[in-house]
């Protein structure tokens, strides 16, 4: 079976993008997604988007983690999808799209800048401290643990992020982990 796809990269993550007309609607969807996302035997990616027509908005997005599980939303990858949809002539510079977490908006500013407007997070926890890293549980369409850190070096973030993701507080599924640093000029580095 041949499935045409696009690969995109956003903030250190990579994603496979497939138009729904090119993806078979079959029972084996989960296993196909697992095989495609496998970095050793497949294309390899952090997740996969299936892009479908929408009767209400510009398009509909279904996001799947690399293990084949469906997730309501992935903001990072949605930026890549937005750029692809614009560059392929399917939408204009500004677009609205449906996800499992509701409607989101994006605007193409350049080939390297996509601005997203997301809905307000549904809830946030009291401060949690897994792996001695103070932060908050936030649901912005997908589950995230967000913590401030002065160190955003890749090795540090990967090692601590992996430990937090697998911490017993977030089992059995784990959690997306984000580190941020506040700049003196009011910017936020993620």
Q: How would you label these PLM feature ranges?
A:
Residues 1-110, 146-190:
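A glycine-rich beta-to-alpha transition motif near the start of alpha/beta enzyme domains, typified by
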Residues 73-84, 122-129, 141:
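Short, surface-exposed, charge-dense and proline/glycine-enriched linear segments
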Residues 118-135, 162:
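Active-site glycine-rich loop that binds ribose-phosphate moieties when present
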Residues 129, 133-154:
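Internal active-site segments that recognize and position negatively charged phosphoryl groups
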């Amino acid at each position: 079976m041949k499935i045409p796809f696009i690969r995109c990269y956003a903030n250190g993550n990579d994603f496979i993008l497939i138009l729904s007309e090119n993806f078979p609607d079959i029972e084996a969807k989960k296993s196909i997604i697992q095989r495609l996302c496998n970095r050793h035997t497949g294309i390899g990616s952090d997740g996969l988007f299936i892009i479908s027509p929408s009767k209400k908005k510009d398009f509909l997005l279904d996001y799947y983690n690399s293990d084949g599980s469906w997730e309501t939303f992935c903001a990072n990858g949605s930026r890549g999808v937005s750029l692809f949809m614009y560059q392929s002539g399917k939408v204009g510079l500004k677009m609205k799209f449906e996800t499992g977490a509701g409607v989101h908006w994006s605007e193409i500013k350049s080939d390297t800048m996509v601005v997203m407007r997301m809905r307000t997070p549904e809830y946030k926890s009291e401060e949690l401290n897994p792996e001695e890293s103070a932060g908050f549980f936030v649901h912005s369409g997908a589950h995230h643990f967000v913590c401030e850190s002065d160190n955003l070096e890749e090795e540090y973030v990967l090692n601590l992020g992996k430990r937090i993701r697998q911490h017993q507080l977030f089992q059995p599924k784990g959690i997306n982990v984000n580190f941020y640093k506040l700049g003196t000029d009011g910017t936020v580095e993620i």
